[in-house]
């Protein structure tokens, strides 16, 4: 197992590529101001301080995500291929492997209960349709016989 070695503002992990610097999430979280703005996108750390004033959506949008994992927000906006290419120039390293969430380790119950929610998704409308059918038939039959 690789053990991290401290190296100033980042960490190098033994056995990793020599050019990759790893940052702990605690360190990224400290860089959340206009003077120093870091964010994580897809497990990679970016220093976007110089880009704040150039961002088409305004610097406020970036500062809201500063010091945190902005992957979901970045993807929700639907950035162009040019924007993704531009992002590369702000890359400074990767999130330390021990800070990365394992894929499939989702603690969000709404995502883990897909079987449970799928039957409920269909059950309620079907019961509702049957109930409406009985009520319609009952009242329609009553109005026809009068």
Curated annotation (Swiss-Prot):
It is found in: Mitochondrion outer membrane. Residues 1-11 form a propeptide. Pfam families: Cyt-b5. Heme binds at residues 55, 79. Keywords: Acetylation, Electron transport, Heme, Iron, Membrane, Metal-binding, Mitochondrion, Mitochondrion outer membrane, Phosphoprotein, Transmembrane, Transmembrane helix, Transport. PROSITE patterns: CYTOCHROME_B5_1, CYTOCHROME_B5_2. The modification N6-acetyllysine is found at residue 30. Residues 20-96 form the Cytochrome b5 heme-binding domain. One of its GO terms (molecular function) is metal ion binding. GO terms for biological process: nitric oxide biosynthetic process. The chain crosses the membrane at residues 119-136. Component of a complex composed of cytochrome b5, NADH-cytochrome b5 reductase (CYB5R3) and MTARC2. Cytochrome b5 is a membrane-bound hemoprotein functioning as an electron carrier for several membrane-bound oxygenases. Belongs to the cytochrome b5 family. This is Cytochrome b5 type B. It comes from Mus musculus. The lineage of its organism: Eukaryota, Metazoa, Chordata, Craniata, Vertebrata.
């Amino acid at each position: 197992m690789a053990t991290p070695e401290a190296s100033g503002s980042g960490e190098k992990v033994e056995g990793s590529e020599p050019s990759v610097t790893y940052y702990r999430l605690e360190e990224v979280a400290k860089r959340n101001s206009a003077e120093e703005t870091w964010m994580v996108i897809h497990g990679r750390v970016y220093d976007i301080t110089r880009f704040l004033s150039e961002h088409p959506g305004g610097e406020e949008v970036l500062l809201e995500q500063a010091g945190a994992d902005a992957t979901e927000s970045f993807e929700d906006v639907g950035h162009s291929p040019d924007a993704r290419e531009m992002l590369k120039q702000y890359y400074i390293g990767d999130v330390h492997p021990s800070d990365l969430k394992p894929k499939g380790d989702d603690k969000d119950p709404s995502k883990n209960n897909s079987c449970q929610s799928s039957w409920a998704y269909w059950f309620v409308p079907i019961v509702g349709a049957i109930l409406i059918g009985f009520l319609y038939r009952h009242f329609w039959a009553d109005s026809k016989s009068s």
